[in-house]
């Protein structure tokens, strides 16, 4: 092998087969793609051990991608049920799946997942550590934390969330700046607990170079987690969040020195007018690295509808340059998502990504909308259904409510503007009262 | 009576009882409210014949309001079924209901609606004209169109959509600038048809002064309709739309000369990065009149999910100064909404309005979110439910998936960040493995 990672290849001027695939999918000139990868503006998460992967690029100028969270846990230990979700998520064209398994047969699940998934796979190794070692959190050693990451690399995981920006300095900032919801990142709170209980530095920060060696060995992309992301509107864009983002910027450069591909994770909860500033800050402080956000949720008051609060935030974020959206389901803040929750979350997230792509001018994004609108103008229902983000639902909705006239729908009936405009523009009369035509 | 309309009162320095109610609800100084009403920046739609009205203000500095569309039609003629929806819409705190009835016992429905509704009532009189006169559209006379408006005024309608900006000039612009989806406004397309079939000027434009006399007599607010609103991403912010908006600005001034309160209606479909410019244009060209938008829908490709595409657009619009959102349901582009569709539409729209209010800094808007986040930090589930935009759904979601530990939820179980942070910050240990606590 003439290169270690995709970034190393890009910097050496080598075109990998993954680059070729991404270049074709996105209709991006391969030299431009390679240059952006060399600069870290685009990543192709592709672990050398993930043989079934259909690679996707994430970053500048590319379509906004979405991630689906799954995994087994104490409250939901059924491997087969989760693998069923995986199949559907892939059918629904999620580009990434994060395995957040925290309990039970996590190794079996992860290996099956990597084996079957054409979508890229991400994990948060710290979730797996307690179960893997069967040791209480505070007793896990620094070396053991790193070994879990290595294990995930061996298993073919394409990107790992590592909360390396939570260090003694950012913890000081956190303690000085009171928050309403403290640390809401699951991995972040576990690391904070470990640091406090052991009075030690964050092992992922302290042994960051070793971590990078592991990532480079498998070409595992590092997704720098935002342990201090805001968990409420009140905490949005606060000192702790920005202090951590600055550390993530430093860690980005160190990763790039070792040709490790980097993604930056972002909020969280914030008022929608703060989103643009957050994207600008990330792109600046993290030197153009791809930005991956969880939401942002633009209000706290809608549990049961956080697929909507995050679709609002995600669309705005994507329009300003966010590259990768983590889906949020209606179950957020309430329970583990069911299969139906997952589907709703995927669709809301894909809508947000596409709305963002239209706004940021991703090449070809508006062709889809143009086709749909032309079908609407022609009242070509079959064409409309086939272009719908959810063909089945659109079809079902119309079928459940049959219109008087086949060309219109029950919303307007014979007052359908499309129907009447088409007639008038063809020089025909229109009628509302008569039923013969 | 010492004044004709709320605007007339405001200009004469008179404080009406409606102003007092709105001032208290919004916690806005009554003199500021009165001044803004005198300038046309705030309206209180309140027909003198709508006795059951609980008045609401719409405009600058006030909470963003939402409207629910209802009504009987050929495909859904059941008066009682629609009145049942009305009750639920009011229970769900929709501030406005537009009766879009187009067929059947529209008079009976409208009168019952006004009689029972504490929410303000709007109509689009042209929808009612064909049925009211039992005459084909093109045979309805100018005087008859105006008489329908008068009838709605007598019946106590608080605001009427009048597409007076579609005139011979704007039709010329429309014909010169090809569109993908032509005219998608139902009322707009009917008026266009009438104008083309009769080769005449738009009666609402030609007899605008007479129309204003009618509106002034009942203090019926005029909601200047956007006949030329874009119906597709491709047509967003085009020449026809802006040409009409300029006419609406002229008509606004003419209405204000007669103390008639004015709302401006807006898009429609557009890329999300165009929304801010649209709000700036409306506020400028229409001299600060309140802006009422249908969406905007930020993509065309999601029939079945247009409550989400419009929540994205509506939240952004509200954040930039839009004052009033027309709800959009999952049934948009497919069928008349069912009761369930209506509920989903109301909630999505309320989320958008509130997210906008947080961003534009409406007084007190963030208190709701702060309370919710404090409840989350305390893991006080009862408090969270009672603060939820949909208490029932939030409760049901949690109940359907019981967690191992009562304080957490099945999403994270014992890895709950709130739970663990609270323990660590109290100096306690945490455990993930042991089940005893």
Curated annotation (Swiss-Prot), chains A, B:
Cofactor: [4Fe-4S] cluster
Described function: Catalyzes the synthesis of the hydroxymethylpyrimidine phosphate (HMP-P) moiety of thiamine from aminoimidazole ribotide (AIR) in a radical S-adenosyl-L-methionine (SAM)-dependent reaction.
Binding site for substrate: 69, 98, 127, 163, 185-187, 226-229, 265, 292
Reactions catalysed: 5-amino-1-(5-phospho-beta-D-ribosyl)imidazole + S-adenosyl-L-methionine = 4-amino-2-methyl-5-(phosphooxymethyl)pyrimidine + CO + 5'-deoxyadenosine + formate + L-methionine + 3 H(+)
Entry binding sites for Zn(2+): 269, 333
Residues the record lists as binding [4Fe-4S] cluster: 409, 412, 416
Source organism: Alkaliphilus oremlandii (strain OhILAs)
Cofactor, free-text remark: Binds 1 [4Fe-4S] cluster per subunit. The cluster is coordinated with 3 cysteines and an exchangeable S-adenosyl-L-methionine.
Superkingdom as given in the UniProt entry: Bacteria
Protein's name according to its UniProt entry: Phosphomethylpyrimidine synthase
Pfam family, one: ThiC_Rad_SAM
Lineage: Bacteria, Bacillati, Bacillota, Clostridia, Peptostreptococcales
Annotated EC: 4.1.99.17
UniProt pathway annotation: Cofactor biosynthesis; thiamine diphosphate biosynthesis
Listed transmembrane segments: none
GO cellular component, one term: cytosol
GO aspect biological process, one term: thiamine biosynthetic process
Molecular function in Gene Ontology: 4 iron, 4 sulfur cluster binding; carbon-carbon lyase activity; zinc ion binding
Keywords annotated in UniProt: 4Fe-4S, Iron, Iron-sulfur, Lyase, Metal-binding, S-adenosyl-L-methionine, Thiamine biosynthesis, Zinc
Family recorded in the similarity comment: Belongs to the ThiC family.
